[in-house]
């Protein structure tokens, strides 16, 4: 009888451990295309899961967005974020903080660049993520605000933004 109870206890513990491991992401790298979001109107992103816990995961993400000079938008955006992901199986809540580096040019009358400089915006992320722990498809929707400043004319300026993304994990 003692052996039976011990066997049942071991089976229960083993299945509990296996169930928790199934919440970890199998694929720790991903590429994503985002409309809106931290790259303003669009961005291509690479993400790496740094800490892969049962419920809590931490990721680092870097993206890039380029806008031609004729668009009137800052030329280059490079958003860099650290995200904390809380998992409920295949559904996740994301909370992130970062900085969107921008590289832009002052242009002359013929639209030729005369002076390039790095600037940027503080940015964040609060959103939903759909990704099965062993799946490759990633779907995301998030509130992605920007904080601009300080400058000679404003202390800080808040810009509300949002984005949706689709990605592939590998």
Q: Where do the PLM segments sit?
A:
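Short glycine/proline- and aromatic-enriched beta-strand/turn motifs that initiate or cap beta-hairpins
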Residues: 19-75
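Bacterial Sec-dependent N-terminal signal peptides
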Residues: 1-23, 166, 170
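Outer-membrane beta-barrel transmembrane domain signature
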Residues: 53-59, 66-170
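A general structural-boundary detector
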Residues: 6, 17, 32-33, 113, ...
């Amino acid at each position: 009888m003692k052996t039976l109870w011990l066997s049942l206890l071991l089976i229960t513990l083993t299945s509990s451990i296996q169930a928790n491991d199934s919440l970890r992401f199998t694929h720790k790298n991903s590429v994503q295309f985002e409309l809106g979001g931290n790259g303003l109107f669009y961005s291509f992103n690479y993400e790496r899961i740094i800490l892969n816990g049962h419920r809590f995961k931490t990721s680092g993400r870097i993206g890039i967005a380029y806008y031609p000079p004729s668009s009137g938008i800052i030329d280059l955006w490079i958003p860099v974020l650290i995200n904390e992901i809380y998992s409920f199986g295949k559904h996740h809540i994301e909370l992130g903080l970062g900085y969107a580096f921008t590289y832009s040019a002052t242009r002359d009358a013929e639209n030729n660049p005369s002076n390039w400089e790095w600037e940027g915006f503080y940015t964040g992320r609060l959103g939903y993520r759909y990704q099965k722990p062993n799946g490759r498809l990633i779907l995301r929707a998030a509130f992605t605000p920007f904080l601009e400043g300080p400058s000679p004319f404003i202390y800080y300026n808040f810009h509300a933004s949002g984005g949706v993304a689709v990605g592939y994990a590998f």
